[in-house]
């Protein structure tokens, strides 16, 4: 089954690569319209997925990721329309010039070909990835988690209907709708057809892909994100940032999971933090110093060492008091996932040092980690957030779905 999907996707990719920006945008507009027109069928499938997931004991954080509402689906359709408004990188001449040999050389952006994406309970990923791949002239094979296979299947049927209406092969966007996990292993070996693989899920999935895939893999999306409250931090705006970073949508990978507090501000800052977190319903996981300083009103439990590597994806927050900037940076290097980390400070020397020494895809000064997102960065919907350094890093927008080719123009030009 998968080989036939691969053959069809590769054939579709050749046709997609030749489309003009206008043709691709018309397809995306049609997809957005169909998502709204077929909303009832998608939501009906999603209700079944959510009910099954709840019966299987899926956590509330995961259920939130899985659930669609009319408003969320409308927002997804609007995101597709936003992709239409983005500049098409395909065909862009990155650099080049006339060589001494007389050869005129260009380095031009081109589609990757076929992209494979493996993801878990995030039905919005289906549309986000499909729209970005189509905008960049790539075909895509999607493998969502078993928790979302009804939703994904319904969504892909809608996308394929739009493709067909625009005279394009339905195989441009395909989904593996069989939840059998063995198909993941088969997909990882489809290097003959898939040019790049993007896993979006937990550490186990990323490890499997790194170890078993014969396809180039871009990993990311695991966010043990940190905020360091420096000794010079202004407490009121710092609390506002922390509330946003923790509570706006706790199930996302750019949510803060560990708060590092400079010891010189701890006694003034921690009580204010506790009050704010109590109002926000956040449970604090405190180290020894925190446990000694705080006695309410927020719910407080002793921090377990293994929790420092946790992506809670819930209203839980580690709080650790560190001696100084060195301690904060060392902690992030040991426990961070190179996703998103922030410093809250009024000392711009410390801010500059933090930015230079924390090796993460996104580093913030006096801002929430929640900004690490393709839409917030002006990239449109994102394929993933890469925490590695090759071939992309941070939110992966359109350019991350392209490669380049060298094109030489001559006039009977030969090498001397």
Swiss-Prot record:
Cellular component GO terms, alphabetical: cytoplasm
Signal peptide (UniProt feature, chain positions): none
EC supergroup of this enzyme: oxidoreductase
CDD domains xref list: ALDH_F18-19_ProA-GPR
Swiss-Prot/TrEMBL GO biological process terms: L-proline biosynthetic process
EC number(s) stated in the UniProt entry for this protein: 1.2.1.41
Keywords: Amino-acid biosynthesis, Cytoplasm, NADP, Oxidoreductase, Proline biosynthesis
Keyword Transcription regulation: no
Pfam families: Aldedh (PF00171)
Compartments in which it is found: Cytoplasm
Protein role: Catalyzes the NADPH-dependent reduction of L-glutamate 5-phosphate into L-glutamate 5-semialdehyde and phosphate. The product spontaneously undergoes cyclization to form 1-pyrroline-5-carboxylate.
Family statement: Belongs to the gamma-glutamyl phosphate reductase family.
Name the UniProt record assigns to this protein: Gamma-glutamyl phosphate reductase
Protein source organism: Salmonella typhimurium (strain LT2 / SGSC1412 / ATCC 700720)
Upper lineage: Bacteria, Pseudomonadati, Pseudomonadota, Gammaproteobacteria, Enterobacterales
């Amino acid at each position: 089954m998968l080989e036939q999907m691969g053959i069809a996707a590769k054939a579709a990719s050749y046709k997609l690569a030749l489309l003009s920006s206008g043709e691709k945008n018309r397809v995306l507009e049609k997809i957005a319209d169909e998502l709204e027109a077929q909303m009832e069928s998608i939501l009906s499938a999603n209700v079944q997925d959510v009910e099954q997931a709840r019966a299987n004991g899926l956590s509330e954080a995961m259920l939130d990721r899985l659930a669609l509402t009319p408003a969320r689906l409308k927002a997804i359709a609007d995101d597709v329309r936003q992709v239409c408004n983005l500049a098409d990188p395909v065909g862009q001449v990155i650099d080049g010039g006339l060589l001494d040999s007389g050869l005129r050389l260009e380095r031009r952006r081109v589609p990757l070909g076929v992209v494979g994406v493996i993801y878990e309970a995030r039905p919005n990923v289906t549309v986000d990835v499909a729209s970005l791949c189509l905008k960049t002239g790539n075909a895509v094979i999607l493998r969502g988690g078993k928790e979302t296979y009804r939703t994904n299947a319904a969504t892909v049927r809608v996308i394929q209907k739009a493709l067909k209406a625009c005279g394009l092969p339905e195989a441009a966007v395909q989904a593996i709708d069989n939840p059998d996990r063995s198909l993941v292993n088969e997909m990882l070996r489809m290097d003959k057809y898939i040019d790049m693989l993007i896993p979006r899920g937990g550490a186990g999935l990323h490890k499997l892909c790194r170890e078993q895939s014969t396809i180039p893999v871009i990993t990311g999306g695991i966010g043990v994100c940190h905020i360091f409250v420096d000794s010079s931090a202004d407490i009121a705006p710092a609390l506002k940032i922390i509330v946003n970073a923790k509570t706006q949508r706790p199930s996302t990978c750019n949510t803060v999971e560990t708060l590092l507090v400079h010891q010189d501000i701890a006694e003034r800052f921690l009580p204010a933090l506790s009050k704010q977190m109590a109002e926000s319903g956040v449970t604090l996981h405190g180290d020894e110093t925190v446990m000694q300083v705080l006695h309410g009103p927020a719910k407080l439990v002793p921090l377990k060492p293994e929790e420092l590597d946790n992506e809670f994806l819930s209203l839980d927050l580690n709080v650790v008091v560190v001696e100084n900037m060195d301690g904060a940076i060392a902690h992030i290097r040991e426990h961070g996932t190179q996703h998103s980390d922030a410093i809250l400070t009024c000392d711009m020397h410390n801010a500059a040092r933090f930015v230079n020494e924390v090796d993460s895809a996104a580093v913030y000064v006096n801002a929430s980690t929640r900004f690490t997102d393709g839409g917030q960065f002006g990239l449109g919907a994102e394929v993933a957030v890469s925490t590695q350094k090759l071939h992309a890093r941070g939110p992966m927008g359109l350019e991350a779905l392209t490669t380049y080719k060298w094109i030489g123009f001559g006039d009977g030009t030969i090498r001397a």
